[in-house]
Design a protein with these regions (language model features):
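Helix-to-loop junction immediately C-terminal to a conserved catalytic motif
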Residues: 66
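Conserved ABC ATPase "signature" region
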Residues: 114, 129-147
């Protein structure tokens, strides 16, 4: 049975669009095609999830949006301008995976956040009052102002994630790419990060979140991209997260269980419950569709040092 492919119709770049990827193909020097026929459009004021198995092209797509890879075909527009123009204006920020950072490098929290201001400084890279003010505001927003003089390697996993979010805020970026922001953090920290992303969405920013944590995606992502060297499905998360689409994207990687109610009174929303799990955070499908969990109480307090 062919999966229920959900792909948004082609959209021409215009005001209000954050990231537009049109018919993109990326090939490496060895001839390997890492990504092909990739098309989607994410409007401003949106949180979108990028979901797929390891090696499916997520990192390639991020690198293409950041301008690190030459496109063999197609184009990428960011905020109705070329990637190069968006980068020159410091409009794209990247929050890396934890394993991509050398936590032993001796640098203070405030210095990491100040790196987000480099594009706003002159040739000598001397921070001005506006740069210090931006760093202060960013640290306060992620509740880490009291840890600014700490070595970043001394922080907890969740605090480290929030430092790089603060760097993106100090940069004054409008598009933020987050690579596995919930890996190695507890539920409380995950909720804090999600709350911040939701606030940024209200400000009209665009966030593309690469994650393996399927269970949390329906809670905060407006749209979802399923990727496997091409775009398998793109659209509203509730429409993309179907059993057929997930089996095509994750077949053989995630365990899948279906619970079918035998009760004649279960013809409603709980007649069929599917579970996709990798033992981290299961994704629950009710009658074949993903649903967000009830919102938990918001807690803006930071982790203990």
């Amino acid at each position: 049975m062919r999966p229920d492919r959900v792909v948004a119709p082609p959209v021409s770049p215009q005001i209000g669009q954050g990231i537009v990827v049109q018919d993109v193909r990326v090939c490496y020097c060895n001839g390997h095609t890492a990504l092909y026929d990739a098309s989607f459009a994410i409007p401003t004021g949106t949180i979108a999830a990028l979901v797929g198995v390891n090696g499916s092209g997520k990192s390639t797509l991020f690198k293409a949006i950041m301008g690190f890879l030459r496109l063999a075909q197609g184009q990428i527009r960011v905020l109705d301008m070329s990637v190069q123009d968006a980068l020159r204006r410091n409009l794209i920020a990247y929050v890396p995976q934890s394993e991509d950072v050398d936590w032993n490098f001796p640098v203070l929290v405030e210095d990491v956040v100040m790196m987000g201001r480099y594009g706003h400084m002159g040739m000598l890279r001397r921070p001005k009052a506006a740069d210090h003010a931006a760093v202060d505001a960013a640290l306060a927003r992620v509740n880490l102002a009291d840890l600014r003089k700490r070595q970043i390697g001394e922080l907890s996993g969740g605090q480290k994630k929030r430092v790089f979010l603060a760097r993106a805020l100090a940069q004054e970026s409008r598009v933020i790419l987050l690579d596995e922001p919930f890996t190695g953090v507890d539920v409380k920290t995950e909720d804090q990060i999600i709350a911040l992303l939701q606030d940024l969405r209200c400000e009209g920013r665009v966030m593309l979140v690469s994650t393996h944590n399927l269970g949390s995606v329906p809670d905060f992502c407006d749209r979802t991209i399923l990727i496997k060297h091409t775009i398998l499905a793109f659209g509203a998360t509730s429409e993309v997260f179907t059993q057929a689409n997930l089996e095509q994207a994750f077949g053989g990687v995630l365990r899948h269980f279906v619970l079918q109610s035998a009760s004649p009174h279960a013809a409603g929303r709980d007649a069929s419950i599917g579970v996709f799990t990798d033992d981290e955070r299961p994704l629950i499908l009710r009658n074949g569709k993903a649903q967000a969990r009830p919102a938990r109480a918001r807690d803006d307090t930071h982790d203990a040092p």
